[in-house]
Swiss-Prot record:
<dbReference type="InterPro" id="IPR023148">
    <property type="entry name" value="tRNA_m1G_MeTrfase_C_sf"/>
</dbReference>
<protein>
    <recommendedName>
        <fullName>tRNA (guanine-N(1)-)-methyltransferase</fullName>
        <ecNumber>2.1.1.228</ecNumber>
    </recommendedName>
</protein>
<comment type="similarity">
    <text>Belongs to the RNA methyltransferase TrmD family.</text>
</comment>
<comment type="function">
    <text>Specifically methylates guanosine-37 in various tRNAs.</text>
</comment>
<keyword id="KW-0489">Methyltransferase</keyword>
<feature type="binding site">
    <location>
        <position position="113"/>
    </location>
    <ligand>
        <name>S-adenosyl-L-methionine</name>
    </ligand>
</feature>
<dbReference type="InterPro" id="IPR016009">
    <property type="entry name" value="tRNA_MeTrfase_TRMD/TRM10"/>
</dbReference>
<keyword id="KW-0819">tRNA processing</keyword>
<keyword id="KW-0949">S-adenosyl-L-methionine</keyword>
<keyword id="KW-0963">Cytoplasm</keyword>
<comment type="subunit">
    <text>Homodimer.</text>
</comment>
<keyword id="KW-0808">Transferase</keyword>
<dbReference type="GO" id="GO:0052906">
    <property type="term" value="F:tRNA (guanine(37)-N1)-methyltransferase activity"/>
</dbReference>
<dbReference type="GO" id="GO:0005829">
    <property type="term" value="C:cytosol"/>
</dbReference>
<dbReference type="GO" id="GO:0002939">
    <property type="term" value="P:tRNA N1-guanine methylation"/>
</dbReference>
<dbReference type="Pfam" id="PF01746">
    <property type="entry name" value="tRNA_m1G_MT"/>
</dbReference>
<feature type="binding site">
    <location>
        <begin position="133"/>
        <end position="138"/>
    </location>
    <ligand>
        <name>S-adenosyl-L-methionine</name>
    </ligand>
</feature>
Length: 246
């Protein structure tokens, strides 16, 4: 997967390219992240990248000319078929379904806003989709872009040591993940659930599904409203609810 990034702070993306799962993906040639800074497309000695908004008001907007030229440079490097995404509070909210959709793209260009945002005409002429990571305000689009890169890269074959890790993550099937345990077997008097030590894979699968359903019911009940539960899932959820009556 190839991802181009338009950002005034390209050095921030070393967190993606140099560390963790994504860093290994870059090292192994499974993921490529290339950055362009609008500041490199300025022609004044101050390398100006912001401009005043028409109509007045507080704050500045990203200057149109450097931003457009940076996007055009990224498009030229990407070639045909690259989807251009603007990280914006006005965009579609990113969830696991959206991550799965975005992961089908082999090329993406992520545009990170700063200041009060981007000229609407740039969005209309250069941007294919807008995406948001939540209903809150950040200083820029870099952290949302890194969130998007990290989440979609997990679906690139070979990135995770065990591909089932991505398939069993929270939200993949619309449910929260089940609890997990490792050594020691007893920690401050709290024991690992015996079923996980039993070696009975059918019972372990059943326990994990039951806990996943129950945790979703307790913490994010609205997620269950959009799911068509199987007969087995309904039975397991009912069991969990009986066991956890207030």
């Amino acid at each position: 997967m190839w991802i181009g990034v338009i950002s005034l702070f390209p050095e921030m993306f070393r967190a993606i390219t140099d560390y963790g799962v994504t860093g290994r993906a870059v090292k192994n040639g499974l993921l490529s992240v290339q950055c362009w800074s609008p500041r490199d497309f300025t022609y004044d000695r101050h390398r100006t990248v912001d401009d005043r908004p028409y109509g007045g008001g507080p704050g500045m907007l990203m200057m149109v000319q450097p931003l457009r030229e940076a996007i055009h440079a990224a498009k030229a490097a990407a070639g045909e078929g690259a989807k251009v995404i603007y990280l914006s509070p006005q965009g579609r909210k990113l969830d696991q379904q959206g991550v799965c959709e975005l992961a089908t793209n082999q090329k993406m260009i992520l545009v990170c806003g700063r200041y009060e945002g981007v000229d609407e005409r740039v969005i209309k002429t250069e941007i294919d989709e807008e995406w948001s990571i939540g209903d809150y305000v950040l200083s820029g689009g870099e952290l949302p872009a890194m969130t998007l890169i990290d989440s979609v890269s997990r679906f690139i074959p070979g990135v995770l040591g065990h591909q089932a890790s991505a398939e069993e993550d929270s939200f993949v099937d619309g449910l929260l993940d089940c609890p997990h345990y490792t050594r020691p077997e007893v920690l401050e008097g709290m024991e690992v659930p015996p079923v996980l030590l039993s070696g009975n894979h059918a019972e372990i699968r059943r326990w994990r599904l039951k806990q996943s359903l129950g945790r979703t019911w307790l913490r994010r009940p609205e997620l269950l409203e959009s799911l068509a539960l199987t007969d087995e899932q309904m039975v397991l959820l009912a069991e969990f609810q009986r066991e956890h009556k207030p």
